[in-house]
Amino acid sequence: MFSEKMLELGRHSSVIREIFEYSKKRKAEIGEDKVFDFSLGNPSIPTPDAFRQTLVDLIENSNPVDLHGYTSAVGDNTARQTIANNIKKRFGFDQSSDLIYMTCGAAASLTVTLKALLNEGDEVILLAPFFPEYKVFVENAGGVVKIADCNPETFQPDVDKIREQLSDRTRAIIINSPNNPTGAVFSRDNLLKIADLLSSQKHPVYILADEPYRTLAYDGVEVPYIPAIYKNTVVCTSYSKSLSIPGERIGYIAVSPECEGARDFFFAICGAGRSMGYVCAPSLFQKAAALCDTLPSDVSAYDRNRRLLYSSLSEIGYTCILPEGAFYLFVKSLEQDANAFSMMARKQELLLVPSDSFGVKGWVRIAYCTSYEQIEKSIPAFKKLYESYKVR
């Protein structure tokens, strides 16, 4: 009676969302301050004052019909040109505004781009661990997922593992750096090796650079701009994390002008958006986000949280990967079954995301985009959880 695939997706929410919904229920039962919810990557830093003021200025000083009316399907031309100019200023890369498509966030950017790129049975390589919805996006576009494990010690890409997954049906590889769930920032050296490998293929293999965490990096680590490294790159990004506006759903696709078939690729993106009912991204937020495109992200609060959580858990005895970016800590499960470990953590009111849905086993993800006070209060619970395994 209904689409079996869509019914199955609707009946079973993602693990992250399931934990988030459990959190709301549990907080209502025992009190919000007694539940340590580290499930959802929801920014805790307030939206910058400059962004809020930009919204006010636009509302007060713009023609309301123009401000709230339709833009072109590809986006507001001034916003697209502003973004292209800023890419040139920030990265020294000549991005044509005619190859920028405004979207409702990075998820929409990826779904549209995959729909534009894939024919039935085409393959997309995912670097494990990966954001779980990638698999949904690829399969919804008719693609087949191929998984290449990252280095288990550093979670940097393993070029040999990528090579093993390449075939004549490979159309793309999704690269997410800074990475969700590990917090790893992929090094320039590794990206150059991937670029060399992909360039050696007989047909174009595109990098889809998923970059919502680009501005969230610590200790001066470099986050290389991939289009400047590999010509067949499409950037899929959003302002959700950089401006702390995840609920506003605004982002863009930037097709590198150096891509093979760049113009036709962009036309296919336009066609994919049309086929999926995307009329245009929210007009007000297109304009506001573009005007605030270069606002620096204040990562000091996240950095403080990162240092506290990493040092505290390491001192207790947990094995952790020190994140270089984003706002996630990847922690080794105290038993091989991360789902079972996650359920044990619930007994201490710790809500952690098991790594199975990220494509690897034996880890949990902790989203530390929360208050410093909550992290401080959670440390005794992590200690009790650790000690409970010592006596088993």
Where are these regions (language model features)?
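PLP-dependent enzyme catalytic core of the Aspartate aminotransferase-like
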Residues: 85, 89, 163, 340-343, ...
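Accessory recognition modules or surfaces
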Residues: 276-281, 309, 328-348, 367, ...
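Conserved core of the PLP fold type I
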Residues: 65-201, 215-228, 234, 381, ...
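Conserved core segment of the aminotransferase class I/II
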Residues: 231-303, 307, 386
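Conserved glycine-rich beta-strand-loop-beta hairpin in the small C-terminal domain of fold type I
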Residues: 283-290, 302-314, 320-332, 358
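N-terminal small-domain helix-loop-helix segment of the aminotransferase-like
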Residues: 2-104, 112, 292-299, 389-392
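Short amphipathic alpha-helical/adjacent loop interface patches that line ligand
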Residues: 80, 159, 209, 306, ...
